[in-house]
Amino acid sequence: MDPTSSSSSALRWKILRQALLRRSDSQSQTETKRISRKATQGFNLIPCQVVDSSPQSDKSREASVCYTLPITGSPKLYLTQRVDNCSDLNDFEISNRYNIDNTGLVCQWPSEEVLAYFCKSQPERFRGKRVIELGSGYGLAGLVIAAATEASEVVISDGNPQVVNYIKRNIETNSMAFGGTSVKAMELHWNQHQLSELTNTFDIIVASDCTFFKEFHKDLARTIKMLLKAKKASEALFFSPKRGDSLEKFMKEIKDIGLHYILTENYDAQVWKRHETLVKGDEAWPNYDKNHCYPLLIQITNQI
């Protein structure tokens, strides 16, 4: 075995151990920085800052983060989310019980920020539309769509019941920002075969970082086809890095189920500019790698 690969694997296990034990010693931090690709600010497209972190024991794992949208009026959204490195065994037990991943609890993933930024930049695309976000995590993109685009309805969904509870709280916190847009949270599992009240009802599906696990690809592709309007123009907008061959295999499932897709690498000037800066090296995102970190845009349609 390649000793470098073995060392990297050991350090990744150390990252997981830190998340469970909440270690923070300097030696461990130095070692894991060498292998971790975790970003401190993501693509830094939507300014954010922690505005509250309660010291009480029942709230010690949570923080309130303020996101200031870079649009006219600079509206703010407040999201309650987990602080870093605080996963516990209960999180993994729930993940196993529901046959889901718990990545939505880990952090605010960079592609979610890119999705949110892209959507707020194209309000006309969403105006008057029914929108659903899949695998939303804390719901940043869905909340941005609700606050900045005049969509008629936004459903923010995830398969993890713990995550859905966070979404509900975040919707309630920001309810005054949505104007006339109806916003709700939903626990949605991609292997559900009965979604009669949702079948063929959405104009737009959005999602980010949802294609990493190949075992979910077939169900995800089926869910997309089931949710999109079949007799009117509709689309799904996915943002995801290549991550080896995972994205390629997902797109094959999309094609096999009878949907069509367009893959775009450079879809926004500001995102691309930030990407080029990170490729050259930036301490805010150690070990940045295009294949692993840069989200491509996949536009999926029925092509009626």
UniProtKB/Swiss-Prot annotation:
Tissue localization of expression: Expressed in discreet spatial and tissue-specific patterns including root tips, leaves-tips, floral buds, stamens, hydathodes, stigma, anther, siliques, apical meristems and germinating seeds. Also observed at high levels in the root stele region.
One MF annotation (Gene Ontology) recorded for this entry: calmodulin-lysine N-methyltransferase activity
Keywords linked to the UniProt accession: Abscisic acid signaling pathway, Auxin signaling pathway, Cytoplasm, Developmental protein, Methyltransferase, Nucleus, Transferase
Enzyme class: transferase
InterPro entries hit by this protein: CaM-Lys-N-MeTrfase (IPR025800), Methyltransf_16 (IPR019410), SAM-dependent_MTases_sf (IPR029063)
Changes seen on gene knockout: Suppressed calmodulin (CaM) methylation, especially in roots. Longer roots with ectopic root hair cells in atrichoblast cell files and the presence of nonhair cells in trichoblast cell files. Increased number of epidermal cells in the root elongation zone. Reduced root growth inhibition mediated by auxins indole-3-acetic acid (IAA) and 2,4-dichlorophenoxyacetic acid (2,4-D). Reduced sensitivity to abscisic acid (ABA)-mediated stress leading to green cotyledons and normal germination in the presence of ABA.
Gene Ontology BP, a term: response to heat
EC number: 2.1.1.60
GO cellular component: cytoplasm; nucleus
Chemical reaction(s) catalysed: [calmodulin]-L-lysine + S-adenosyl-L-methionine = [calmodulin]-N(6)-methyl-L-lysine + S-adenosyl-L-homocysteine + H(+)
Inducers of expression: Induced by salt (NaCl) stress. Accumulates in response to osmotic stress (e.g. mannitol) and upon biotic stress, e.g. inoculation with the oomycete P.tabacina. Triggered by auxins indole-3-acetic acid (IAA) and 2,4-dichlorophenoxyacetic acid (2,4-D). Repressed by kinetin or abscisic acid (ABA) treatments.
Compartments reported by the entry: Cytoplasm; Nucleus
Functional note: Catalyzes the trimethylation of calmodulin. Regulates roots development probably by modulating auxin signaling responses. May be involved in gravitropism. Involved in abscisic acid (ABA)-mediated and abiotic stress responses, including salt (NaCl), cold, drought and heat stresses.
Annotated family: Belongs to the class I-like SAM-binding methyltransferase superfamily. CLNMT methyltransferase family.
Subunit structure: Monomer.
Name by which UniProt lists this protein: Calmodulin-lysine N-methyltransferase
Organism: Arabidopsis thaliana (Mouse-ear cress)
Gene: CaMKMT
